[in-house]
Amino acid sequence: MEEKMLPVPNEGHRRRRFHWGSIATVILVVAVCVYAFTLFGDKESPENTQTANDDTDWNLVLVNYENAIPENYESKLVEVPGGEKVDERIYDPLMEMLEAAKEGNWDQLPMVVSGYRTQKKQQQLYDDKVAGYRKEGNSQSEAEELAKQWVSVPGYGEHQIGLAVDINGATYDLYFWLQENSYKYGFIFRYPGDKTDITGVAEEVWHYRYVGVEAATEMYEKGLCLEEYLAERQAVRH
């Protein structure tokens, strides 16, 4: 299928923490496969381990290149339009957000092009990405490091807990709308370009994570990523 690019936004559309120059060539209308290759991880065992019984709100569990999915973590899944699945606890706010987002998407319902992923699926995506970089002439270690910028190592990705979605639309305006309104529904723009040194992930304007309205609102108002929010929250508790 021929790939079709979305229209490039003009300067008047720019928003804070939004760096379109670096991603204008990556956001595709129908290239679902690109959006599948979206998370960053680390193959090495993390220093901080979690279990499903830790005193952490389910919606604020941290999964990234340093923090593996909690042991015995389980998600009850439900299907969304398009066939992808998410944790049933985020279904209602997700659908409310997508319905409202039609105003920024030419009155079309945005699509979830990647939701929950199994361990097998995540492994396949990671291996395929590594293989792609190997074909470009990179060594195995180089290919793995490059792959981690876009695909999380199995066991270290938010898609495997069912709380993250990759959203595709008909226009770039959708992503502007999501950045400015997703918090109202409990979702956060998970990987902004100016937080890469903290999240370890390149800017992904399509990737949204559910954290709850209260947390999402505070993160939006303070300009925090999830790692910063949780660190601040922990400091207050102590």
Show which residues each predicted segment covers.
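Extracytoplasmic cell-surface/polysaccharide-interacting catalytic and binding patches
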Residues: 2-238
